[in-house]
Amino acid sequence: MEQNDLGLIEKIVYLNRVAKVVKGGRRFSFSALVVVGDGKGQVGFGLGKANEVPEAIRKASEKARKEMISVPLLDGTLPYEVLGRYGAGRVMLKPASKGTGIIAGGPVRAVLEVVGVHDILTKAIGTNNPHNVLRATIAGLASLRSADEVGQLRGKKVVTPRK
């Protein structure tokens, strides 16, 4: 996990080496899956491909910065339970009480850490392909709506309860 000059947190989720067999031997190429976030509700991901690892990572992080989405957070967790779907991948994201931590594995953990979630329960179902699991997680987070957005859609006034 590294932080760049814009205050964005960058995480490499997956690096893959592929080989093309040619007359002279094997030609290797690399793909990198990177997530970028600000730790305050913004997140994006990118897939970069190149002949060298650093170039693939650079391309992936550029794409991730261009396609960032905003996620409504509530006290370091999500406002409600959501299920993200992509391909065969399903990711269940369930809000948790303070002190629980991030109960997640692999790509799901990387996304939640860069988005700024501190307490959550998750379960990835159907596939363990990092690309599909990551996209299912992003799809789930993108489907979240804040209380104000829901109120506007329903034409109702949002009232916050007193503690």
UniProtKB/Swiss-Prot annotation:
Oligomer status and interactors: Part of the 30S ribosomal subunit. Contacts proteins S4 and S8.
InterPro entries listed in its UniProt record: Ribosomal_Su5_D2-typ_SF (IPR020568), Ribosomal_uS5 (IPR000851), Ribosomal_uS5_bac-type (IPR005712), Ribosomal_uS5_C (IPR005324), Ribosomal_uS5_N (IPR013810), Ribosomal_uS5_N_CS (IPR018192), Ribsml_uS5_D2-typ_fold_subgr (IPR014721)
UniProt keyword Metal-binding present: no
Name of encoding gene: rpsE
SUPFAM superfamilies noted in UniProt: dsRNA-binding domain-like (SSF54768), Ribosomal protein S5 domain 2-like (SSF54211)
The record's note on its domains: The N-terminal domain interacts with the head of the 30S subunit; the C-terminal domain interacts with the body and contacts protein S4. The interaction surface between S4 and S5 is involved in control of translational fidelity.
Taxonomic lineage of the native organism: Bacteria, Pseudomonadati, Thermodesulfobacteriota, Desulfovibrionia, Desulfovibrionales
One Pfam family per UniProt: Ribosomal_S5_C
Coiled coil (UniProt feature): none
Domain S5 DRBM stretches: 8-71
GO annotation (BP), single: translation
Name the record gives this protein: Small ribosomal subunit protein uS5
Keywords in alphabetical order: Ribonucleoprotein, Ribosomal protein, RNA-binding, rRNA-binding
NCBIfam families: rpsE_bact (TIGR01021)
Record bears the keyword Amino-acid biosynthesis: no
